[in-house]
Amino acid sequence: MSVEETGWVTVALVGKTRGNRGEVTAVVLSSRPERYQDLQEVFLFGPGLPEAGERREVEEAWYHLQTLVLKFRGVDTISEAESLYGAEVRIPASQRISLDEGEYFESDLIGCEVVDRQSGQSLGKVSAWDDGGGSGLLVVGDLLIPFARAICVEINPAAKRITVELPEGLKDLNRP
């Protein structure tokens, strides 16, 4: 893995210190918690770190009371661990875990053009993902679209396009 690589994926956010050996807690940004136990090397991005990211070897990764704990090689004191608070833990996109058919990375949906199947009109581009619903929500302008098979009938992240069949009245729910 090299720092020059593009296409980073943020997989966690560094939280508070834990213990006195330089361990940190982390906010998990994956629906597959087991993925963290295989991490060997990551790049940290954030205030006080190089703009291109700082390579860190993961010495250990485990869960304590449903909280991810990370131990980075060379981070051995509380003060060293505190300096990492808030950093984004990233990996190259090429090292993302494999998905099952019909599963998508949220980051791949951002920027997709959303097209109404009935009218053929563009509703805009997905600007964000919101976990606020059972299936998640695509944020398209001021419109929140449930990410459900019955609504998102064609999903093609490679073509940056999502075709939707919106239930009657959905457009009016979120409009000012």
From Swiss-Prot:
Main location: cytoplasm
Stretches of the chain forming a coiled coil according to its record: none
Leader sequence residues: none
GO molecular function: ribosome binding
Gene3D superfamilies linked: PRC-barrel domain (2.30.30.240), RimM (2.40.30.60)
Locations listed in the record: Cytoplasm
Keyword terms: Chaperone, Cytoplasm, Ribosome biogenesis, rRNA processing
One Pfam family in the UniProt entry: RimM
Domain PRC barrel: 101-170
Cited InterPro entries: PRC_barrel-like_sf, PRC_RimM, RimM, RimM_N, RimM_N_sf, Transl_B-barrel_sf
PANTHER family assigned to the protein according to its UniProt record, in alphabetical order: RIBOSOME MATURATION FACTOR RIMM
HAMAP family the record matches: Ribosome_mat_RimM (MF_00014)
Family listed: Belongs to the RimM family.
Function description: An accessory protein needed during the final step in the assembly of 30S ribosomal subunit, possibly for assembly of the head region. Essential for efficient processing of 16S rRNA. May be needed both before and after RbfA during the maturation of 16S rRNA. It has affinity for free ribosomal 30S subunits but not for 70S ribosomes.
Entry protein name: Ribosome maturation factor RimM
Organism for this UniProt entry: Solibacter usitatus (strain Ellin6076)
Gene: rimM
